[in-house]
Amino acid sequence: MTVVHIFWSLSFGGIETMLINIANAQVEQNAKVHVIIINDLYDDELLRKFNRQVIVHLIHRKCGTKSLSFIFRMNRLLVKIAPDAIHIHMSKFYKLIWSKRLRCMTYVTLHALPRGSVRPNHILYRFFPILGLYDSGNVVFIDEVPGVFAISEAVKEELWREYNINSIVVNNGILTRSFNHRLNKPMGEVMNVVMVSRLEHNKKGQDLLIRAAAVLQGKIHVTFMGDGSSRFFLETLARELNIEKYIRFLGVQSQSYIAEHLCDYDLFVQPSRREGFGLTVAEAMASNLPVLVSAGQGPAEVTCGNCYGWVFENGSVDDLVKQIEYIHSHYDEALSKANRALQYVCETYDVSVTAKKYLKLYQRMN
């Protein structure tokens, strides 16, 4: 089977890491895999992580350009490759595929909770689908794609509830064997807490964790890996609460660094207000690290509620503090739960499981 993945860019991030891992895993399962990167925005280190058997095509579209030449190049490539399945990772790409035959074998994964309009009201969208590229939502044209996948039950349920579109859940996968494991040893006097995510507090909830650290006054040290538009706000908040010495911003770290160093911490916290899945939660579980996540979102789905981690009331600093204090004083229980979570995540969220399910669905739905 020949599979083509189409992606906008390739920079450090959870979705990009997932794309590399799935492409590599599909090759290992004897598929012929091509990856088309449209924008001239990619990281050479990430490109080198593709299996040598994965064929990567760089379109080199300049960011912000109004040129449409990249559409011609992409379609020529697709005709030349003659794939059995085209897997797009943004629904807006669907209308850029000209061949009706190729459109019939196209699938899309919704990588986050749905937002925006499926069918923009402006009449120009009907005649100029290229305008869909500038739509800020993530569901434009998704109702026309033959096969729709959702990364979690939370995403599937909201896509059905808000847009009446059915989808099949295929959980995102991680390379579980690449993560160093935390030893089953007690923590020190101070609990070292880590969060790995873009710094977008309105969605990811980093401000909740900073406020919790202020309440706990020295019981925890918090490290944030990642960068984003909220960094200045979060640094200012830490200063205003007079807890700069308990908060550390490491910035963006490579996937290899994360896989090597998650095990250095005592607790992983994902306090997202709105989150479709929670790939970094699975990574923490693969590191044998106790995890604490917000309720009612994708991360709590990954932990099966309190079965493989702890859950606090979404948006509540008080409950976040309460759960951290409980884990702090019952750390033997936390380590025991982390051991069970490690086995569960390897069986459920390893990328080999994800890749195999995608290949089976391509064949079944074609």
PLM region descriptions:
Residues 88-94, 110:
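Short His-centered aromatic/hydrophobic patch
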Residues 139-181, 192:
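Donor nucleotide-sugar binding/catalytic pocket of nucleotide-sugar-dependent glycosyltransferases
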Residues 273:
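Aromatic "clamp/platform" in nucleotide-sugar-dependent glycosyltransferases that forms part
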Residues 75-76, 127-147:
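Membrane-proximal helix-turn-helix segments that form the acceptor-binding/catalytic region
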Residues 5-21, 25-67, 160, 228-230:
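N-terminal strand-loop element at the rim of the active site
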Residues 290-293:
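Short hydrophobic beta-strand element within catalytic cores of glycosyltransferases
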